[in-house]
Amino acid sequence: MIARKWAAAGVALGLMAASPAFAGPECQNGQDFPRWLDGVRREAAAAGISQATIQAALGPVQFDPGIVKRDRGQGVFQQTFLQFAGRMVSADRMSRGGALLKSQAALLGRIEQKFGVPAPVLVAFWGLETDFGSDKGKYPIFTSLATLAYDCRRPDFFRPELIDALRIVEKGDLTPGQMVGDWAGEAGHMMMTPTDYDRSGVDFDGDGRRDVINSVPDALASGASLLVHFGWKRGEPWLQEVRVPADLPWDQADLAIRHPRAQWARWGVAAAHGSLPADGQPASLLLPMGRNGPAFLAYPNFQAFLGWNKAFVYATTAAYYATRLSGAPPVSPGNGPITPLTTEQVRELQGLLVRRGFSREQPDGRIGNATRSAVKQAQMRYGLPADSYPTADLIERLRGG
């Protein structure tokens, strides 16, 4: 199971391991939890939620220090795209995903007809999030969300999630006892946050309830609805592996920059398999491991993967897995040896980027969008290929000023 949405609150859950530097200051709020929970009850009532729902859902809730410990224990480990994709897009997961594409073909076809999201995309998320429903979590969601909303780190993020979880019960979609999921409050086959569930949940089996935990039709259709919310466009591609030349203008390899496929073709970019139409379809060049690693054209629909999970490696892996389920062969490792930076090297790099004026972000050991952007600026300053991928060579240049 991979917790995902909380990345929007500054945490890339699921792509992390213990790191004291990320844990932040201790926070002791447990003594006043009952009084705080009374405030949540009042807020929920003001939002139109009945006292019966409030009591049923929040009555059994107690502060769980184990949830806080898990949250505090989330730090960073570095995995490259090839490492993460190699682990997550395993032969077993390919086999089971392919089998589900066949056994659930009728359902997936109806969902695609309604929402425009292809079956391989939904099955890819289903596999990555809960291993096709086999690991949906065991934590009482109201206890998890109340604990995280009360904790001092991100109350403004989790408190609305708690209120939206109450809305789900109020609408009759699930009972409080059925609201069981990940320790961070996500639920169901597709691991939806309560806010996403309440906004994008779909009753696709026609029983009058939107049940993303127990109903596969509801869960998959809700996932498709959520992707549409994140900008998915019917009938458009999302990711295509390509080969890149040695003399490409690397500063154009940026998700914020799009060019027509015809322009990429003029620069020597070619499809890794099949052909690359030299047309006006816009695409960004995605280099998850720099110019010597795998290369993809990321189409506008790739933004829906980033909407689902802002963690760059996860989003790329999900999109790649969907292409594999669509029939694409395994990705090429690229053109040359790549030595990923360690977590300590990333922290040093980030500190140097701040010192040299390329960034204002506090070093945290994570290679996120801000670090990649700062790396690109530094590469351009020092005359290095500006592919946004951090290297030991760049660290040496930054050390020297």
Regions found by a protein language model. Name each.
Residues 1-3:
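N-terminal secretory signal peptides that target proteins for export/translocation
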Residues 29-56:
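Mature N-terminal segment immediately following signal peptide/propeptide cleavage
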